[in-house]
């Protein structure tokens, strides 16, 4: 397995990953259409995404896993933390160390940038919760909330 940083050149591989995800589990909440691809492509030239860090796990010549994070700077305590936005592995590649390798690589890259805390919302499904409980030096605490700003 090879872990690589997600760059613009990887977009076709990631689009195929998204399609492979849907072939094995059809419950994802967004469509892989031209608008989606255009938005992802634009994110690589939009400075608003400069604090984003995404890694891809390649195996058998294709993307089988992905992890996405964003740096969060806070004047609350003058710290920089990171938010874990998403981690996902194609179902047929789960329980083979892919998610662990992605998480380890992300933690290493964040440490290199002086970030010592990664914060994430916990998915409601039990499989994801088992994964988070298995992470070394991690603890489940607090609760997350999604607040819609369109009111």
Predicted regions, residues:
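Conserved beta-strand in the GNAT
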Residues: 56, 62-71, 83, 88
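Conserved beta-strand-loop-alpha-helix junction that forms the acyl-donor binding cleft
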Residues: 119-129, 146-151
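A conserved beta-turn-beta hairpin within the catalytic core of GNAT-like acetyltransferases
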Residues: 72-84, 94, 140-142
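Conserved GNAT-fold acetyl-CoA-binding loop/helix
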Residues: 22-42
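Conserved acetyl-CoA-binding loop of GNAT-fold acetyltransferases
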Residues: 132-143
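A short helix-loop-beta-strand connector motif used in the catalytic cores of GNAT acetyltransferases and
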Residues: 42-56, 83
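Conserved acetyl-CoA-binding loop-helix of GNAT-fold acetyltransferases
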Residues: 89, 95-108, 134
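A short beta-loop-alpha structural element at the N-terminal edge
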Residues: 1-16, 27
